[in-house]
């Protein structure tokens, strides 16, 4: 059963020690890379991860298929621990437009070079909002936003901003693939 008030659906039943155990088991020896794809940490697990001080040197975070929703992304985007990230992979997390907005306005994620938001129920609203803030992400060279619900208006906003910034690879949908800037 999945609904907004369901604590289990949000990951509330997983203890912080369980989340920490999962993170430590999947953290690279140098502490720079963490891949917990399909770890299903959900919203509260993302909250725990955002506070783990031992992740302060993390540069690459892969958290696809963790179903954290927009609130989980809010914790990551506002984390004072995860400020060194250069790669963030959040495919299939049901973040929607609200989640994209948390990322777009985050001062803590400005070091990102690679951002994957594939399959997250993002619409034109989220794409247009993200496009407004992309110029602040001066290090971003790859944005993967395929398999969302973005129509032509949102795609056009992202294409226009790509012309003005350092974004070299813009992946909008499965048909057109890479939009490479020369």
Where are these regions (language model features)?
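Leucine-rich repeat
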Residues: 15-24, 43-57, 70-84, 97-111, 136-138, ...
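Conserved hydrophobic beta-strand positions in leucine-rich repeat
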Residues: 34-36, 58-63, 85-90, 112-117, ...
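Alpha-helical adaptor scaffolds
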Residues: 64-78, 87-111, 116
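Leucine-rich solenoid repeat scaffolds
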Residues: 137-182
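LRR N-terminal entry segment and analogous cap-like coil->beta motifs
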Residues: 2-73
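Short, positively charged, low-complexity/disordered linker segments
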Residues: 121, 125-142, 146
